[in-house]
Each structure stands twice: as C-alpha cells, then as structure tokens.
C-alpha cells in the first residue's frame, strides 16, 4: 500500500531566460551561420533561399551581400572561409565550397529580415544533360 502524501514544497527560483524569445531579433553584432546546397538537372537557372533562424531587425541591403567563390580570397566584409564563415556587421556572406563546371552565381534577389534568395545559372557552354550543383556555408551579422 502507498503511504500518505507529504506537503507540497516551495517552488524553486526561475532560471535565466533563453538567449532569444519568439518575436525577438538577432542582437547587434551577433552572427548566424549555416550551410547551403543547390542542385538540379537540365535547368537553365535555379534559386536558393538562405533562411536566418533568428530574424534581423531589418533586411540586408543589396550592396552588403557578397558571394565568395571557391579559391577567391576573403574580403574586408567577409573575412572568413567556407570552413569558418564570418561576416562583418550588416553584411551577408556566402562562401562556395564548389561550383561545378557549367554553373555560375548570378545574383542575389529578394531580401527579407528572415533571409535572402540567390540565383545560379548554367553557362552557355554547359553540356547537354548538365547538372547545377554547388554547396558551401554562409554568415550574416546584425548591425
């Protein structure tokens, strides 16, 4: 048989809040990073979205979006590498590990507080039955 229940104890202290609560944005100078991949077969172009887990307070300016091709040196705005992506405050940096032959980065498109979109296209000398394949990492830092 079960014994008599004891009195309820006192409630402990509430722990500290998490870093981000729903509705909050990425704090100033904080950085988010991620990985990306794009792949298709026999398409002339393909779009890739880059979603930021924690939204920014404002969308990245189009002049602050950068694409660093495999083998290119880092820049002042994007001092990182594909293995260690970095972005200076207010910058969005995409690092490509590989762009297969017949594929080029075209442009960044629509910008939102929660991400941006990029387009990749096949080059004129892409062989029949080609595939567009690329992958790498990205970083965004809030202003």
Residue ranges and their predicted role:
Residues 1-4:
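Short, low-complexity N-terminal tether/leader segments at secretion or assembly junctions of large
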């Amino acid at each position: 048989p079960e014994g008599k229940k004891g009195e309820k104890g006192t409630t402990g202290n509430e722990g500290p809040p998490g870093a981000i609560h729903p509705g909050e944005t990425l704090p100033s100078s904080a950085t988010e990073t991620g990985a990306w991949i794009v792949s298709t077969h026999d398409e002339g172009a393909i779009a890739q979205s880059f979603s930021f887990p924690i939204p920014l307070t404002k969308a990245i300016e189009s002049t602050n979006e950068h694409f660093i091709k495999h083998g290119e040196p880092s820049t002042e705005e994007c001092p990182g590498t594909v293995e260690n992506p970095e972005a200076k405050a207010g910058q969005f940096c995409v690092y490509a590990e590989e762009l297969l032959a017949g594929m080029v980065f075209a442009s960044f498109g629509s910008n939102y507080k929660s991400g941006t979109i990029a387009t990749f296209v096949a080059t004129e000398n892409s062989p029949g039955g080609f595939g567009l394949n690329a992958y790498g990492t990205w970083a965004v830092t809030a202003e």
